[in-house]
């Protein structure tokens, strides 16, 4: 069985920098450390309000990364233009509301199929591999397939936020079933959102999962143990799963 890919999201390095309006810590430096520690890719979310990652960060990372860039973005003309100009390896289309602290749910592909299909086609024509961040739901998985995206990233937030063991078991089973279904219709399965050092192993053990995108928990741990160690610790969890 292939090894799992770890995508390290460095958004919150930029959050820390922007909290004081200074130039440090530098997301570009953080990405280099994460690469050396075992990250298979670097994920960044260029939000419409630029609350953490900036256009300059995107441009600098494109020049310096030695691993694939996964650019998360809303489905807007501005973001499509930036992605096509930047040429990340992957572009993950996500829903976005300005008032939310973090992405709260999956993209409603079924409800805006024409728009998502058009965005997917434009990005694909530019040589960018498209993933759609969706809930673990058959309707959305089917819509992602119809839209022409080769990859889905299943939203693990409900699993991560489960307050009881029973609820967590139900959510894990839902992720397992959705992963199996998406894989069966020819989609690559990635997962992400809310994953940390105590809940990632079970998700990583789902056979169809290829990549986990994890950010906040790694950056939070980095404050205590350093970024290199924080990434290595998560890498070890993924390696244990396979």
UniProtKB/Swiss-Prot annotation:
GO terms for molecular function: pyridoxine 5'-phosphate synthase activity. Keywords: Cytoplasm, Pyridoxine biosynthesis, Transferase. Pathway: Cofactor biosynthesis; pyridoxine 5'-phosphate biosynthesis; pyridoxine 5'-phosphate from D-erythrose 4-phosphate: step 5/5. The keyword Signal does not apply. One of its GO terms (biological process) is pyridoxine biosynthetic process. It is found in: Cytoplasm. 1-deoxy-D-xylulose 5-phosphate binds at residues 11-12, 47, 52, 102. The keyword Transferase applies. The record marks 153 as: Transition state stabilizer. Pfam families: PdxJ. Homooctamer; tetramer of dimers. Belongs to the PNP synthase family. This is Pyridoxine 5'-phosphate synthase. It comes from Idiomarina loihiensis (strain ATCC BAA-735 / DSM 15497 / L2-TR).
């Amino acid at each position: 069985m292939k090894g799992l890919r770890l995508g390290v999201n460095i958004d919150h390095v930029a959050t820390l920098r922007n909290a004081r309006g200074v130039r440090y810590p530098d997301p570009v430096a953080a990405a280099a450390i994460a690469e050396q520690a075992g990250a298979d890719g670097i994920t960044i979310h260029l939000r419409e309000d630029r609350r953490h990652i900036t256009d300059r960060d995107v441009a600098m990372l494109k020049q310096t990364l030695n691993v694939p860039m996964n650019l998360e973005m809303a489905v807007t003309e501005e973001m499509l233009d930036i992605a096509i100009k930047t040429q990340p390896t992957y572009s993950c289309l996500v829903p976005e509301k300005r008032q939310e602290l973090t992405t709260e749910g999956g993209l409603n592909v079924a409800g805006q199929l024409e728009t998502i299909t058009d965005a997917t086609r434009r990005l694909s024509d530019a040589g960018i591999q498209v993933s759609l961040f969706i809930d673990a739901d058959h309707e959305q998985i089917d819509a992602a397939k119809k839209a022409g995206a080769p990859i889905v990233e299943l939203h693990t937030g409900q699993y991560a936020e489960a307050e009881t063991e029973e609820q967590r078991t139900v959510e894990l089973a839902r992720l397992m079933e959705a992963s199996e279904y998406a894989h069966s219709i020819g989609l690559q399965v990635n997962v992400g959102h809310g994953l940390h050092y105590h809940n990632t192993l079970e998700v990583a053990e789902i056979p169809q999962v290829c990549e986990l995108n994890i950010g906040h928990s790694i950056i939070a741990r980095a404050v205590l143990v350093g970024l290199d160690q924080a990434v290595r610790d998560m890498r070890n969890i993924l390696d244990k799963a396979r």
